[in-house]
Amino acid sequence: MADSKEIKRVLLGPLFDNNPIALQILGVCSALAVTTKLETALVMTLAVTLVTAFSSFFISLIRNHIPNSVRIIVQMVIIASLVIVVDQILRAYAYEISKQLSVFVGLIITNCIVMGRAEAYAMKSPPIESFMDGIGNGLGYGVVLVLVGFVRELIGSGKLFGVTVLETVQNGGWYQPNGLFLLAPSAFFIIGLLIWGLRTLKPAQIEKE
């Protein structure tokens, strides 16, 4: 029977207390690449969350039957299979977004968050807890992506979800978009500010020398 306290811990912990990006510094590369628009950030969040949750679930189901010498290969095969399914669904039902995400959906296979949860948690825990752990870490990853995507799209183009929020000078409005926010380095600074803000609110997360 699933432990409700453990489920609550693994589901809510990664949101702020043990965020994959802000605290563990995992999955940063894709966070730089897919956050120029809020829409792509949300789709990437959904994709990573589903892959992490179901890969952890399936790996946990067969964890006692996986030889230690090939466990990484088995994990990669399961993760890769799920990523292919997600990629094909995106191509079929959201082709434009799939084109914008480009190779980054495929690179979920090597995402440290997905591999890390499979190895560190799913190989040692029951299926339900592992599934919820995957959901929690996917959402923790997504919180940062959505915040970064929100700031970059709004300041970089004056839009959200492609809809004009701040009328630009070119269209007779007052706002002058800052194109620097559409470049990857801006995401570094925004993520850095998020990490600073989170650790200011939660001093216990600051590494001790």
UniProtKB/Swiss-Prot annotation:
Catalytic reaction(s) noted: a ubiquinone + n Na(+)(in) + NADH + H(+) = a ubiquinol + n Na(+)(out) + NAD(+)
MF term (GO), any: oxidoreductase activity, acting on NAD(P)H, quinone or similar compound as acceptor
Enzyme Commission (EC) number: 7.2.1.1
Superkingdom of origin organism: Bacteria
Keywords: Cell inner membrane, Cell membrane, Ion transport, Membrane, NAD, Sodium, Sodium transport, Translocase, Transmembrane, Transmembrane helix, Transport, Ubiquinone
GO CC entries: plasma membrane
Keyword Transport: yes
Record field: transmembrane: 42-62, 70-90, 103-123, 131-151, 178-198
Keyword Transport on entry: yes
InterPro entries given in the database record: NqrD, NqrDE/RnfAE
Lipid bilayer topology: Multi-pass membrane protein
Biological-process GO terms, alphabetical: sodium ion transport
Pfam family, one: Rnf-Nqr
Primary localization class, coarse: membrane
Location in or out of the cell: Cell inner membrane
Family: Belongs to the NqrDE/RnfAE family.
Job of this protein: NQR complex catalyzes the reduction of ubiquinone-1 to ubiquinol by two successive reactions, coupled with the transport of Na(+) ions from the cytoplasm to the periplasm. NqrA to NqrE are probably involved in the second step, the conversion of ubisemiquinone to ubiquinol.
Quaternary structure and interacting proteins, as annotated: Composed of six subunits; NqrA, NqrB, NqrC, NqrD, NqrE and NqrF.
Family matches, as NCBIfam families: nqrD (TIGR01939), PRK09292.1 (NF006777), PRK12405.1 (NF009070)
Protein name: Na(+)-translocating NADH-quinone reductase subunit D
